[in-house]
Amino acid sequence: FQTDLWQPGMAIVDFTNPEAAKWFAAGVRKLCEMGVTAIKTDFGERIPTKAVYYNGADPIHMHNYYTYLYNKTVFEVLEEYYGKGQACLFARSATVGGQKFPVHWGGDCSAEYTSMAETLRGGLSLCSSGFGFFSHDIGGFEATASPDVYKRWCAFGLMSTHSRLHGSTSYRVPWNFDEESCDVLRFFTKLKGKLMPYLFAQAVKTHTTGIPMMRPMVMDYTDDIACRYLDQQYMLGDSLLCAPVFRKDGVANFYLPEGKWYDIITGKTYEGGKYHAVTCTFMEMPVLAKPNSVVTFGAFENQFEYDYLEGADAMICNLEDGKTAEASIYDTKANLVLTIQATRKGNVISVETSSTDKTFTVSVAGTDKKITLQGGKGEIVL
């Protein structure tokens, strides 16, 4: 099958033919040798249902299964070249089993608020179907976003598992919109860099358990009826709730389950068990640490792959009397390097960390209380 639709000489490779798959893999390997570390496996969904396959497969069945073979072929080349656990795609199409070849993104959204909200709904649907990670075209793909839409999408995109600026007919670089867009993109990029110890630990959990890193509220709060219908917010890992702004007036609407929730950007605390409407500047988006949680932060904000333990710190968020909260830090090879446990009794929080030769600071959200440890135990008096 050959077409000249997007560029001359495009063709659909028959991955049921071992020689064809081998030929395609060799091309990918050449890219690796040039220094390419990840591959965008675009398309894969427009597979004709009247095609004849090398192995005689039913073309109706192959319409969905094709993308599995396509992504598998590319993923395995990357894994072979860079090592186990180092392969990464940016895949457009998927089917059952496709979660084994991450990451997937929702392609070709429009550059407007309604499409931004639809993008989140699609991502939550994907992650509810067993896919661990999700990305999207920051700023929208079709047309060109207004500066306000672009800035809100930057916040949403950087607080997704994976982040990429992308567009069809115009560049999505921030200086093409306005000066503040540069500031917004810089701020949320740095926030993501600081959150990497937390985010990477959550990614390791997703890899080992299959629990999606970005997920609808109902997956964590199955007994809270209100969480069954929430499609404009999500959990980013176990401890952070994100509520993007989908309105020109800057209002973020979100619901919080019971307990006190701490906004790691503004430092404000919100009561759970009810809905909230919060007006946000472009430098704000509700990113709320749930009650009885520990969120870890790294020492670097301008890079994403570093020693996550070096200069790291942790924040205990609204730990209730009699409750225990835990967190872990992994190195970039997914080896566990630190565990932290905090238990509250009355006005005293007992903190215990696994042994380490590096100092580690633990603070209490919304207060000036903190303690510095180098392995071992300590107490924080509230």
Protein language model features and the residues they cover:
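Aromatic- and acidic-residue-enriched carbohydrate-binding clefts of CAZyme catalytic domains
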Residues: 1-14, 50-62, 165-176
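Active-site-adjacent "subsite" loops/lids of carbohydrate-active enzymes
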Residues: 1-34
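Acidic, His- and aromatic-enriched active-site or binding-groove loops in soluble protein domains
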Residues: 1-6, 60-71, 105-125
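Active-site groove signature of glycoside hydrolases
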Residues: 24-51
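Catalytic metal-binding/acid-base residues of hydrolase active sites
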Residues: 44, 110, 139
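Non-catalytic scaffold segments within catalytic domains of secreted glycoside hydrolases
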Residues: 53-72, 178-185
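Catalytic core of carbohydrate-active enzymes
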Residues: 75-87, 94-105, 118, 122, ...
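Short, solvent-exposed S/T- and G/P-enriched segments that are highly enriched in secreted/extracellular
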Residues: 270-276, 372-379
